């Protein structure tokens, strides 16, 4: 199955890139409103397909050990800043207050992969938080672990679905009104586990969610 995923990724990379390019070129033309909407929809779906293929490849490589992590003692501040900067435009577009508490904490982690895991958590938080809501990032150290929280004022997740949302392609009932492929949380948990950490959620319908990423300090 992993060989199949790799082959699919290789064969679809150029067609997807061409779709995105043509959609972007169309959107720059002086077209009727209906045609502009079609071009925007084409670009959105091509981007979604690109993200899905890339995510499948990443999870496949993580599961087989092909894509290795290189944990080292790292400052969390630049890692958090990297992840937050990537979702800031989306948050601003929805009028969501995105805040991050400065931290002097450090953890034994792979900075690149940790930023990827946090980006997935933040992207979901912004996606499922209504306009005008809040998303906050904060961290805290314990004796052996460092904890990074991504808290939102979004729709929340029923208790019966909280264990299922970390499964590949699973999407909670409340999530179907939003775009997504159901792989971000699975990938984030794989990244956490690959570094000797773990990921958990605390949530309730109508009360938002807090995803906590635990990473070893040494």
Regions found by a protein language model. Give the residues of each.
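Conserved micro-motifs of the catalytic ATP-binding
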Residues: 64-69, 102, 106-109
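Short conserved segment of the HATPase_c
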Residues: 157-170
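Short beta-strand/loop element within the Bergerat-fold HATPase_c
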Residues: 132-144
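Short helix-loop "hinge" at the ATP-lid/N-box region of the Bergerat-fold HATPase_c
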Residues: 125-126
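Acidic ATP/Mg2+-coordinating residue in the GHKL
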Residues: 152
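Conserved glycine-rich
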Residues: 196-198
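Short alpha-helical segment of the dimerization/phosphotransfer core of two-component systems
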Residues: 44-49
């Amino acid at each position: 199955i992993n060989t199949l995923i790799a082959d699919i990724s290789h064969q679809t990379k150029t067609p997807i890139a061409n779709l995105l390019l043509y959609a972007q070129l169309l959107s720059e033309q002086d077209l009727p409103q209906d045609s502009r909407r079609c071009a925007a929809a084409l670009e959105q779906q091509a981007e979604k397909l690109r993200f899905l293929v890339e995510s499948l490849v990443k999870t496949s490589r993580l599961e087989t050990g092909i894509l290795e992590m290189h944990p080292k003692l790292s400052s969390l501040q630049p890692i958090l800043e990297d992840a937050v900067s990537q979702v800031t435009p989306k948050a601003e577009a929805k009028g969501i207050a995105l805040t991050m508490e400065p931290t002097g904490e450090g953890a034994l982690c792979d900075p690149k992969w940790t930023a990827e895991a946090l980006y997935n958590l933040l992207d979901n938080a912004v996606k499922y938080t209504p306009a005008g809501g809040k998303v906050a990032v904060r961290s805290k150290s314990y004796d052996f672990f460092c904890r990074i929280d991504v808290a939102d004022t979004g729709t929340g997740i029923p208790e019966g679905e909280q264990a299922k949302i970390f499964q590949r392609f699973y999407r909670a009932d409340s999530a179907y009104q939003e775009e997504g492929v159901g792989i971000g949380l699975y990938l984030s948990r794989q990244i956490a586990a690959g570094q000797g950490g773990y990921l958990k959620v605390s949530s309730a319908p109508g009360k938002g969610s807090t995803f906590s990423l635990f990473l070893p300090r040494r």
